[in-house]
Amino acid sequence: MRTELPVVGEPRLGLPAPDVVDATAAAGMLADRTRASILALLASGPTCVCEMAAALGERDNNVSNHLAKLRDAGLVHAVRHEANARFLYYERDEAAVAAARAALMDVLR
C-alpha cells in the first residue's frame, strides 16, 4: 500500500543545470590519476600508447583502456603516424578540453 505525501511547496532543488552535468562529466574523466596524467602528457603534442605507458609507469593495455574512455568522452582522438600508418598517435581535442575546463570553471566560481 502506497501513501502519497502531501505537497508542501515548490521544491528548492530541481534537476542540475546543463553546465553542472557537463562539469560532472569532465570531473569524472579527471578523477582518475591516469586519465588526468594522459591529458597532461598530450598537452605537449601527439603521443603513442607505448610512450605514454613508459612515461606513466603503466602497462600499454591500461593506458589504452583509459584512452578509450577519454576518446568516448571526446577529449582525445587518434591520428595515424605520417611516416608509418601502422602507428596510432593520440592527441587532445583542444576544443573539447577547453569546453570541459569552462564547464568546471562555471561551477567552481
Regions found by a protein language model. Name each.
Residues 7-27:
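Short, Lys/Arg-enriched N-terminal segment that forms or immediately precedes the first helix
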Residues 1-5:
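Long, compositionally biased intrinsically disordered regions
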Residues 35, 72, 106-108:
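Juxtamembrane/membrane-water interface recognition
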Residues 69:
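Alpha-helical DNA-recognition elements
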Residues 21-62, 83-95:
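N-terminal helix-turn-helix DNA-binding core of bacterial DNA-binding proteins
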Residues 88-109:
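Conserved segment of winged-helix/HTH DNA-binding domains
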Residues 51, 72-83:
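Beta-hairpin "wing" of winged helix-turn-helix
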Residues 66:
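Residues within the DNA-recognition helix of helix-turn-helix
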